[in-house]
Each structure stands twice: as C-alpha cells, then as structure tokens.
From Swiss-Prot:
Residues 61-80 bind DNA. This is Proliferating cell nuclear antigen. Induction: Induced by the cell cycle inhibitors aphidicolin and hydroxyurea. Induced by gamma irradiation. Induced by heavy ion irradiation. Induced by UV and hydrogen peroxide. Down-regulated during sucrose starvation. Belongs to the PCNA family. It comes from Oryza sativa subsp. japonica (Rice). Keywords: DNA replication, DNA-binding, Nucleus. GO terms for biological process: cellular response to UV; leading strand elongation; mismatch repair; positive regulation of DNA repair; positive regulation of DNA replication; protein homotrimerization; translesion synthesis. InterPro entries: DNA_clamp_sf (IPR046938), Pr_cel_nuc_antig (IPR000730), Pr_cel_nuc_antig_C (IPR022649), Pr_cel_nuc_antig_CS (IPR022659), Pr_cel_nuc_antig_N (IPR022648). This protein is an auxiliary protein of DNA polymerase delta and is involved in the control of eukaryotic DNA replication by increasing the polymerase's processibility during elongation of the leading strand. It comes from the Eukaryota. GO terms for molecular function: chromatin binding; damaged DNA binding; DNA polymerase processivity factor activity. HAMAP family: DNApol_clamp_arch.
Amino acid sequence: MLELRLVQGSLLKKVLEAIRELVTDANFDCSGTGFSLQAMDSSHVALVALLLRSEGFEHYRCDRNLSMGMNLNNMAKMLRCAGNDDIITIKADDGSDTVTFMFESPNQDKIADFEMKLMDIDSEHLGIPDSEYQAIVRMPSSEFSRICKDLSSIGDTVIISVTKEGVKFSTAGDIGTANIVCRQNKTVDKPEDATIIEMQEPVSLTFALRYMNSFTKASPLSEQVTISLSSELPVVVEYKIAEMGYIRFYLAPKIEEDEEMKS
C-alpha cells in the first residue's frame, strides 16, 4: 500500500512541468525514504534525477518498494485539475495497475479523485557517482533562465567558462556573437540574489542551449540554481526543492567540431 499526502500540491505540479518536456514516460520509485525518479530523455543526451524525501510529506506510507510507470503528459493533465492550494494525495495498492490522485481544497469543501493507468516501463538505473567538480556556480535561477533564453535568440550552443573573474556564457550564430558575464556577488540583501563561484581551476565547456532552456523550466521550484562543471564530466544543473529534495539535470558537453567558436 502506498499513500503520500502533500500539503503544497502546487509543488508536484511544478515538478511535472519541469521534466515533462524532457521525459515522456518514467518510473516513479517509492521507498521508505522518499519518492524519486531517474530517467533519460528520448535522445539519451540528458538525464533527470528527482528526489522528494519522505519527511517533506504530511503523511507518507510506503509498505514496500514500489515502481510506478507513468506517462508524464497524462500525469500533468490530471495535476492541472488540482487547484494551486489543493492538498494532493497519491494512492496505489500493491499489485494494482492504477494510481489514484486525490485533490482536496484547503477548506475541504471539494474533493476530486482521478485514477490513472500505470505503464510497464523498462528503465535502467544509472549509478551517478558523487564527483569533485572544478567549478561550482550558484546564482539566481531567474537570471540563469534569462541568460539561456537570450542566448538562444543568437545561437544553438552555449560556452560556459568559469575563471577568477566570474562565469561567462557565450554563443555565436549567423547574426553574430553574444557574451554575458556574471561576477561573484555575495554582498546582496537577500541570499537568493547572490552569485557565488567556487573554483578549483578554470573550466570552459560547450552545451546545447535547447537542453539548458528545458532545464530552466524547474526555476519555479527554487530561487537559486547550482551549476557544477568539470571538463571530463556532464554538467549538473540542480534546483533544490525547499525542505524536500532536488531536481538535478545532467548533460554531456558537446565536443566542439567548430574550432573557430573557441578562438
């Protein structure tokens, strides 16, 4: 038996909006410690990892480990029927091929339940090792989102370079080039407005902007984003989910065919 009750139901809606563009079908894994998902995008270029810890739910019951295969677009359609202030309960019986979503309005004068068929999805769990990164950038998620959007109007790729001076986002396209530099800025009134750079050594990597733009759909979940970079590793773009967990996106760097862009 599985029963999860989430008071801030809007959080689950935001999670779905953050990942459904990348991933169509995925297994949600429930265990005693939390509700998680790990899935590759259809082209096997990006990986998304989600964790919602059990203690973040008002009520969390998971009698045994359970994997529920869901179509994320269908799940998003159901969650759109919930009000932003609704309490969301997810229920599934052992061995059942359906999952039930229950939406309660805060004053409990309206309760709706939606049942959705589960799917059999073959998925392999990739062990993601904890790594040391050459550079870690923390910055306002809205700023990162704006940069990716602005650069997309010029080019298809972004070069992210971290030096002592700051973090530079660059692109080049048919109409010209663009460079945006964010300097370290810790002396802000609000911690969420800070840009903090921890650098062991300078690093410069190239990524596809369409993926970066897709990752920024998680911005409503967190006011800060953490970007971890190392020359031999995929970038990790992480959005912390307050008190509960995180969404992490992993993307392999592009091997730059066009050397002119580097010069």
